């Protein structure tokens, strides 16, 4: 069974967010998602300064099995990207909730966070797959 940290919020499309001290949110894909995809070989990230919209694709994760769109769980401006993934995309596999994060977003509408799933709700999504 996948690890689903309770302090994070989740999108049904298998992204997670974590609130940071500056009010921004770090975004990544869940352990469940990386298990489905398999070994990462390339990650295409948005650019710093890009505006992302909740539910729209904004990044791509390519694995030995498939290329998968990554969707923005919330809307806002991208303020940082995980440049370490350019050389080490396998960080997504080894540390999905830590060093394998994708980007950080300053939210334009924080109420979107409330629409995301808690750990229990995300587990229910996985169970239905």
Swiss-Prot record:
UniProt keywords, alphabetically: Lipoyl
Quaternary structure note: The glycine cleavage system is composed of four proteins: P, T, L and H.
CC cofactor: (R)-lipoate
GO cellular component: cytosol; glycine cleavage complex
Residue span, Lipoyl-binding domain: 24-106
Pfam families linked: GCV_H
Highest taxon of source: Bacteria
Signal peptide: none
Family, similarity comment: Belongs to the GcvH family.
Function per UniProt: The glycine cleavage system catalyzes the degradation of glycine. The H protein shuttles the methylamine group of glycine from the P protein to the T protein.
Sections of the chain in a coiled coil: none
PROSITE patterns according to UniProt: BIOTINYL_LIPOYL (PS50968), LIPOYL (PS00189)
GO biological process: glycine decarboxylation via glycine cleavage system
Database matches in PANTHER family: GLYCINE CLEAVAGE SYSTEM H PROTEIN, GLYCINE CLEAVAGE SYSTEM H PROTEIN-RELATED
Cofactor: how bound: Binds 1 lipoyl cofactor covalently.
Modified residues annotated as N6-lipoyllysine in this record: 65
Name listed for the protein in its UniProt record: Glycine cleavage system H protein
Database matches in NCBIfam families: gcvH (TIGR00527), PRK01202.1 (NF002270)
Annotated organism of origin: Shewanella sp. (strain MR-7)
InterPro entries per record: 2-oxoA_DH_lipoyl-BS (IPR003016), Biotin_lipoyl (IPR000089), GCV_H (IPR002930), GCV_H/Fam206 (IPR033753), GCV_H_sub (IPR017453), Single_hybrid_motif (IPR011053)
